[in-house]
Amino acid sequence: NLQKAYDEGSQIKAATHEYRGVTYVWEVIKNIEKAMSLSGGIYNFGSGNTLNSYSIFTEAANMMGLKEPSKFILPDTERFSDQERNLTMDCSLIEKHGIHFNDSTEGIKEAVLRPFRTE
């Protein structure tokens, strides 16, 4: 947890060889109704991402207003260095049905700006 590490003065490591999407829950809620009318099949459902975990962590810390994220978020260059870990999703199929998710960075920004969104 970024806020906790910052508040406690502790450090966390984030992998530079790992890629994963982070989806703002409100986007899931907004899109779930649309997904209910899809024909049967396998669909990836969530935010895309091109940044590694370390970059996502530092971007999120900056958006949260946490000062000098490089002092408490450390790049873990060894984890997954033998084989890059890519957990990102290709959502092009679901997008063809009008279901769109912002990328992870935009989703995090929305969550920071409007954490208790009700619309």
Give, region by region, the residue ranges found by the protein language model.
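Short, amphipathic alpha-helical "lid/cap" segments that border enzyme active or binding sites
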Residues: Q3, V25-M36, T105-V112
